[in-house]
Amino acid sequence: MNKLFSKSFMPAMLCGMLCISVSCNSANSNSANTIEAENVANPTSKTVVKRKLAYYKAIRTTGAFDVYFTQTNKASSIRIEGAKEDVESVTWNIDKNGVLNIGQRTFDRNFFKGRNRHELKVYVASPDLIAITSTGAGDVKVVSALDTDVLRIEQKGAGDVEFEKPLICDQLFVSLYGAGDADLNKVTAQTVQLELYGAGDMDVNSLRAEKADIKLQGAGDIDVKLDKAGTVNSTLYGVGTIELEGTVNAVNVKRFGSGNIDTSKLRVMTGQRPR
């Protein structure tokens, strides 16, 4: 082999092999249309993985990372940002029911030791969202306005579910189990069901609905600001607190235990007293 050719060929070949290795390490086992990845040798440096996804309409998370959802009129997608080791631990797939399942391949108590779990972020987008199920320690944040027919939210872990922008839907169901929190900014719906079991907190900054059923069982807190709502039924079991304020057409309260249902800031527009 020509020596000049050998000297120029070998570095190029090694560079090509290195680039192929980096791309393979970045890939997840799930099928995808496109991949963009940037990996570096230092496992604590930032890595970004982007992929287009097939259509999905629900999210289920199990892991110690934060998920940010955006409703879009474009194709569904996922983007993961964080340290290389953390990013490569994230797994995802879309099941036959259209649920995007996001988890971690190697999660244990010491996985984020010495690092902030909030530095691992998963950004997802889809035209529709009808359900959120979270069983991990991370947060799920809906960062865009959301318009949907039916939305079911289930939080079974220690993380939070947060809506930063208005939510419009026909039916809304929110269930919290454990120590997690739910924060909804502005909700407009026909019927709403809010349930809290445990020691978590639920806050609805503004709720306008024809009918709302609110139930608390445990030591948690539910705070709801009502905006010209229809009928509100509130039931409390245990030592928790339900606080209702704003304006409604009718309200019914039932309390079992030593907890408190505070209606001192609630105005019933028909002149009816809370009962």
What is the meaning of each model-derived region?
Residues 11-13, 51, 145, 166, ...:
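Generic hydrophobic alpha-helical membrane-segment signal
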Residues 171, 182-275:
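Short, surface-exposed interaction patches in beta-rich subdomains
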Residues 4-9, 24-135, 139-155, 164-173, ...:
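Acidic (Asp/Glu) and glycine-rich low-complexity loops/linkers
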Residues 139-142, 159-163, 179-184, 201-203, ...:
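Short helix-to-loop capping/linker segments positioned immediately adjacent to catalytic or ligand/cofactor-binding
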Residues 11-21:
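Bacterial N-terminal signal peptides
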